[in-house]
Amino acid sequence: PLPPVVKPAFVDTCRAGMTCIEDYGDSTRCGMASFYEALDRTSSSNPEDDGLVRIAVFGDSFIEADIFTADLREMLQKRFGGCGVGFVTITSMTSGYRPTVRHTFGGWSSHAVTDSVYFDKKKQGISGHYFIPREGAYVELRGQSKYASLLDTCQRASIFFYNKDSVYLTARVNRGENKNYSLAPSGDLQKISVEGRIGSVRWTVDRADSTLFYGLAMDGKKGIILDN
């Protein structure tokens, strides 16, 4: 008689032509348990849950200019909610051909971990950059609807910096009226945010002595944020 048929321990449920996200955790699946629980909470009606999951994607040139992450972000935001392109550095070499956000800037001294000289690693942020403004420096992000979905507007726009002295900034949302902000010196990472239905936001540095800037964000208040 023929030997009994042995069922495979794992059956790949990915249909032809699809690449699934693979969990490389151990067999107990404990490594990603908290992440899966956070995804479940995106649909929670509990007011104590903010229902927000932030995912940071680190990679090589395959994620440059959102090549891979644009599709991943769109898929996750359609499934779990959310909007906006997430974190963007103050300046970027790929701003001219990144299709997921319109990014313009001027008046900045940019420093990256890949620089051969004049880079102080003690000053770098999570992206491996820091940016020093000249007077009148500005940076603007504008959503777009021609590439991927849920990127034309966001609900919260933020700018991140570290200031040893007072800092004075101006925010202009949807090319409307300017709103002025001033923050006292701090030893911690600082953030200023504006909220609403935001299609564009422009930040201008009015004065920022001894201040390092790191990046911006266009986020939703619930669902998925995926940073490239």
Model-predicted regions and their roles:
Residues 1-58, 62-228:
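N-terminal secretory targeting modules
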